[in-house]
């Protein structure tokens, strides 16, 4: 935030109100956000590879799938929610909370399982914190690129985002293979270095707090539980979980039609392009 003088008075000027300045600020923010997303995804892919070994080491081989199931549930929920939270909470605050959560999860996971007896639930808690934290970077990257970049740069940065995801997924498998032969606990530390980006992001991310409306907490809760049960259904194929998920999604549909300011409006689901894209994804997934 800068200041300008007009008729003897000093007024605050938001650099993101100027297209040229906002483009420069966005580029400076996007690089650390992309690196954070890459390191977080790398850690995610690494644990997806070694979760059976981790389950055996913590004495719970039959529950090893929970190490990937719970973070997957969190990922499915936050991917949708973080984008909507940008309408209520400033990106600066959202990313700050995300990086701190990622750092806490990384340090907690390493210390609790390397210096003390490794435990299934300390692994799960740490991975949930890491997943929730790192996904903030991915969501913030897409929001910043969409809102503040010049049109000719948007395609470039969206391409970088896709390429970075594929690269991190590949390197994650490689890193897991190396670190698992030493100590899988070191996987927790991979994204911890991203806390160093916080000072840069505090200077380059917008501090506007959206439209001033209150966060739609009830809507987030209903949608979150519906998504959680749907994810659990695909992990355990328990039909009652699918039934609960459907009931909650129906309740969510009723809620957003009656709520004054839902975090997502019914008009979103009437978007024909979105419906076609989702239909194609479902066809390719199930056929």
State each model region's role.
Residues 1-42, 53:
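Cytosolic juxtamembrane N-terminal segment immediately preceding the first transmembrane helix
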Residues 18-26, 112-117, 266-272:
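Helix-boundary and loop/linker segments of multi-pass membrane transporters
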Residues 26-43, 48, 68-70, 105, ...:
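12-transmembrane solute porter fold
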Residues 35, 39, 51, 101-102, ...:
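Hydrophobic residues within membrane-embedded alpha-helical segments of Major Facilitator Superfamily
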Residues 46-61, 145:
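Membrane-interface helix caps of multi-pass secondary transporters
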Residues 55, 59, 133, 148-150, ...:
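Short helix-loop-helix connector
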Residues 65-68, 72-75, 79-212:
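Helix-loop-helix hairpins in multi-pass membrane proteins, especially solute transporters
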Residues 182-279:
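Hydrophobic transmembrane-helix bundles of small-molecule transporters
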């Amino acid at each position: 935030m800068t200041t300008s003088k007009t008729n003897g008075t000093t007024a605050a000027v938001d650099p993101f109100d100027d297209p040229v300045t906002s483009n420069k600020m966005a580029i400076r923010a996007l690089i650390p956000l992309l690196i954070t997303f890459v390191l977080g995804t790398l850690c995610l892919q690494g644990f997806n590879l070694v979760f059976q070994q981790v389950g055996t080491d913590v004495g719970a081989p039959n529950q090893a799938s929970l190490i990937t199931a719970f973070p997957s549930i969190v990922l499915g929920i936050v991917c949708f929610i973080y984008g909507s939270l940008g309408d209520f909470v400033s990106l600066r605050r959202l990313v700050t909370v995300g990086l701190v959560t990622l750092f806490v999860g990384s340090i907690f996971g390493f210390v609790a399982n390397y210096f003390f007896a490794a435990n299934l639930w300390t692994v799960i808690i740490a991975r949930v914190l890491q997943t929730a934290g790192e996904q903030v970077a991915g969501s913030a990257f897409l929001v910043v690129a969409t809102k503040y970049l010049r049109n000719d740069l948007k395609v470039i940065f969206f391409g970088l985002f896709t390429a970075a995801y594929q690269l991190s997924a590949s390197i994650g498998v490689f890193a897991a293979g190396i670190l698992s032969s030493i100590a899988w606990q070191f996987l927790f530390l991979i994204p911890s270095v991203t806390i160093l980006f916080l000072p840069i992001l505090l200077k380059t991310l917008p501090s506007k707090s959206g439209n001033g409306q209150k966060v739609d907490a009830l809507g987030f809760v209903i949608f979150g539980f519906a998504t959680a049960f749907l994810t659990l259904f695909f992990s355990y194929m328990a039909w009652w979980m699918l039934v609960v998920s459907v009931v909650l999604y129906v309740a969510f549909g009723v809620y957003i039609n009656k709520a004054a300011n839902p975090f997502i409006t019914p008009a979103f689901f009437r978007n024909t392009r979105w419906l076609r894209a989702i239909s194609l994804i479902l066809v390719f997934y199930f056929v």
